[in-house]
Amino acid sequence: MRVALFPGSFDPVTWGHIDLVKRASLIFDKVIVLVANNSAKNYLLSDVERYELTFEVIASLGWSKIFVDRYDGIILDYALKNDIGFIVRGVRAFHDFEFEFERYVVNNKLSPLVDTIFLPSSDRYLFVRSDLVKELIKNKNFDLSSFIPELVQKKLKSKFIDKLS
């Protein structure tokens, strides 16, 4: 069975993430969406909230080959511990590729057992970023349905509109 890992912070999960996960599921037998923590980032949502929201969104789509997990550690370590041979990384533009390629080189030096697959973002999601969504959610009048699922928009607005205004 060909299993792939799609890691990210998902703060929050966007249509861009979902598109990449769906496309990865066409290539692999199983895809694990891994909600990970990066100590260099400041999160709007807690790790539990990010996991639960990502899980709810994926579950609502009914895709049987896609699973959600969370991990607080090195992504390569998770892949090795769980016998996962591939890490899928989305690439929006050249700066994403440069960053992800450096990560690939390091991972490959540490363990050639796990390979990295780069998927370019679909045109319609090239400029969809979680940090952009967090900035836009401050204005409750914006319709963010082209960036995030309605479930995510409702959750963010109900939870954070008072804190962010």
Curated annotation (Swiss-Prot):
Its EC number is 2.7.7.3. Belongs to the bacterial CoaD family. The keyword Transferase applies. Transmembrane segments: none annotated. It is an enzyme of class 2 (transferase). ATP binds at S9, F10, H17, G90, V91, R92, E100, Y125, L126, F127, V128, R129, S130, D131. Its main location: cytoplasm. Keywords: ATP-binding, Coenzyme A biosynthesis, Cytoplasm, Magnesium, Nucleotide-binding, Nucleotidyltransferase, Transferase. Pfam families: CTP_transf_like. This is Phosphopantetheine adenylyltransferase. The gene is coaD. It catalyses: (R)-4'-phosphopantetheine + ATP + H(+) = 3'-dephospho-CoA + diphosphate. The keyword Nucleotide-binding applies. It comes from Borrelia hermsii (strain HS1 / DAH). Homohexamer. SUPFAM superfamilies: Nucleotidylyl transferase (SSF52374). InterPro entries: Cyt_trans-like, PPAT, Rossmann-like_a/b/a_fold. GO terms for molecular function: ATP binding; pantetheine-phosphate adenylyltransferase activity. The record marks H17 as: Transition state stabilizer. Disulfide bonds: none annotated.
